[in-house]
Amino acid sequence: CTAVAQTPSAYFMEGSTFRSQLNPAFAPLRGYVNIPVLGGVQVNVSGNLSVSDIFYPVNGSLVTLFDKNVSAAEALGNLRSKNMLGTDARINIVGFGAFRKDHKTFWSFDLNMRVEAEANMPYSLFDFLKNGRNEAVINDIKASTQAYLEAAFSYSFPLTDQIYLGARGKFLVGAGRARTSIDRLDIKLQENSWNIDADGSFEMSGLEMSSMQRPDGSEYYSFNDFDVSSYKGPAGYGFAVDLGVTYDVIPDLQLSFAVNDLGFISWGKKYLERGQMTKSQSFTGVEIIDGEVHDPEFDFGELEFDRVQASKGKTEMLRTSINLG
């Protein structure tokens, strides 16, 4: 469970129907019916990496920090030991709400599509890729994404003349998820091959992923041969709540606080694909002629994960966010 502070502009737009998504204690000025999809699309980006750390202007166009026209000193100068980047998107499919007869109590229903992704990339990874080093020790590479449907019912009401409370209950249907974690990756360039010693794992739910087979009959996954043959339908179910409060200090000054996405999704084992990487591997294709390395690029897609039979599903907490205003 990770707490993330958010400051989207809609939070401070009084009367916005989307505002109540950020704090269930907020009520719009009137009832509403959202236009499907167009009724509300929100995208948030968080982390300690900025766009300017990844993309650089070169000759009138944007290139990544790995481009040869961007020096290593410039590309790596703004990076940290741990570089984190996360994004989440909410697309409102159906939304409507109304005041009760007292015009103080408000209720609403929303059906949203939620997509979340995050990654943790250590400095040593960027250093290895940018400088083309012949060996490296890289720890703690993580990447994840998940998508789910959210059916939410909200209710807000005045507790006193100054305090307004709101709560939202949400039933969640997991569409799919993927997690990759490489805890340790020792890489060394030998005479004509890359040798690695690695410890990592990956999981995927909701999609049927084809595995490869070795001559000895064992099965493995490789991202270069990544083949998702079909979508198997809902892969998990869960529940979450949002809680919010507002306090009118004076007529033109209001304080607010909300905690969103307190909940979980339980992903079943039926559509769970799992791989484990705990041994040394060697990739050929590197040529050394007269002491000079040719075709030295390391291909992360060549990493092999041994297929592991899932014995049980997995329950994961949502990424909790806190909004203050």
Task: Name what the model sees in each region.
Residues 6-325:
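Subset of outer-membrane beta-barrel
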